[in-house]
Regions:
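Short, extreme N-terminal segment that most often corresponds to the first beta-strand
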Residues: 1-27
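Low-complexity intrinsically disordered segments
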Residues: 32-123
Length: 123
């Protein structure tokens, strides 16, 4: 479930071997509550606001250190980026090529360890 929370950011990271089109299918239709967007069921919502939700993949799916990948999160704080890297490493993510982040949102993970379009929820 996702709850609007000012000044919070929820992050998912990992490695995906999907093509960009396959990767993007997961969030296709996210701003249309009548769509069958696959992310809706995983996130427990019927709408995802693209003003706050970002999907990112590295060029050509290049796998990079988690420290490099985390720089793509729009956290606007070096401390937050360092915290994301720390938690990612605690969850076994040392490198990757893809991430999602949702600004002003708190995600409550009902099934810890679940993959969301190949990505792990970081926090």
């Amino acid at each position: 479930m996702i709850e609007t929370t000012k000044d919070m950011i929820s992050v998912w990271m990992g490695t995906s071997f999907k093509t960009p089109d396959e990767f993007n299918e997961y969030t296709d239709g996210m701003e249309d509550s009548d769509s069958h967007c696959p992310a809706f069921a995983d996130f427990g919502v019927s709408f995802i606001d693209s003003d706050y939700f970002v999907a990112f993949q590295t060029d050509n799916g290049e796998i990079v250190p988690v420290e490099v990948l985390a720089e793509e999160v729009g956290a606007h704080s070096n401390k937050v980026i360092k915290d994301i890297v720390k938690v990612a490493k605690e969850k076994g993510i040392n490198e990757g090529n893809s991430l999602y982040y949702y600004s002003n949102a708190t995600f409550y993970e009902e099934n810890p360890g679940k993959l969301y379009n190949d990505l792990k929820f970081i926090g």
